[in-house]
Amino acid sequence: MFSIIKNDKNSNARLGVLELPHGKVETPCFMPVGTLGAMKALKHDVLEKLGCDLMLANTYHLYLRPGIDVIKKYGSLHNFTAWDKNFLTDSGGFQVFSLANFRKIETEGVDFKSHIDGSRHYFTPESVFKMQEIFESDIIMALDICSSYGIDYSEASLYTNITTSWARRTLRAYENRKEGYDGLLFLITQGNFFKDLRKRSTEAILELDSPGIAIGGISVGEPRDKYLEILEYNSSLIPKVKPKYVMGIGTPHYILDAIYYGIDIFDCVNPTRIARHGSLLTDNGILRIKRAEFNFDTCPVERDCSCTLCTRYSRGYLRHLIKSEETLGVMLASEHNIHYMFRLIKKARNAIMNGDFTKFRKLYLSKYDEGNFDE
């Protein structure tokens, strides 16, 4: 299922291979977010060309639209979307709990109001697992409570206890899954930013012995030093034999931090979201193409990049497309940013293999953070 190929000598970074129903995934792995089973402005064949083996889709959004019955009719999410690589499906917990004024958390589950039409719905750990079983997801995420940064201890403790209870119920459902379905279950640790709650949560989750472990509830608006503190602490509590996943991190420095502390999988909408607004990832930081200085710029966005944008088009032309709100501009910028993330991960893997990841991370971050294009 998960094999470690090499450990870095100077950090907890490691190379691994995750065996999933729709093929092998090399780790560390950045997972693009295709919320509704598709990447915004990127066709499947472009993703395949870029080397994407694992895409995230969201159970909450797919449940609301097109609906579980539609996907069930097709036999799986893979059949419905014509994507023959792997899917990780998020439980939808983050989306439900971000509704704030439109949901009610109970020990049994969560009652919430649709953001689309205001209709009311109820999720339980069992129902969320069943949906992902219908999807035939390659990685299934348990329903959890992602609490906000800054809540008090008692509330964080309550949410941690409920998450653990839901993890037990999800595991029972997983153990009784339909015959022939071999997706992997990842249970989620919580605890907010309290170390004793993190320890309690992680120990309880580890007792359940799920195939994979996710660290939830970080990168939710906290300062970077607090993020690093909890990332390092929570990761250290999880045995190295388990594949580790941190949800919702997608900036280069956060990802390299995660790799340093032994995280194998991460995802974020950030690369494509910022692309739609004209922000391009480069080794010198973020290039904001809408700036007037790029109007007459005949250079590619990045000289050593082999994506469609950089091998064919200029900064000036991309600026024209983005400023004119042309779809092609968004497509090119999105492809570039996803290609950039995959290229960064490949560089990190090579550095781990060569035994100089710590040096690579330090040099990369000094260049990225001090780049000419940062505001």
Curated annotation (Swiss-Prot):
Family statement: Belongs to the queuine tRNA-ribosyltransferase family.
Pfam families registered for this protein in UniProt: TGT
Source organism of this protein record: Borrelia turicatae (strain 91E135)
Cofactor: Zn(2+)
Metabolic or biological pathway, per its Swiss-Prot or TrEMBL entry: tRNA modification; tRNA-queuosine biosynthesis
SUPFAM superfamilies assigned: tRNA-guanine transglycosylase
Protein name: Queuine tRNA-ribosyltransferase
Quaternary structure (record): Homodimer. Within each dimer, one monomer is responsible for RNA recognition and catalysis, while the other monomer binds to the replacement base PreQ1.
Residue segments, region RNA binding: 248-254, 272-276
Cross-referenced PANTHER family: QUEUINE TRNA-RIBOSYLTRANSFERASE (PTHR46499:SF1)
Keyword terms: Glycosyltransferase, Metal-binding, Queuosine biosynthesis, Transferase, tRNA processing, Zinc
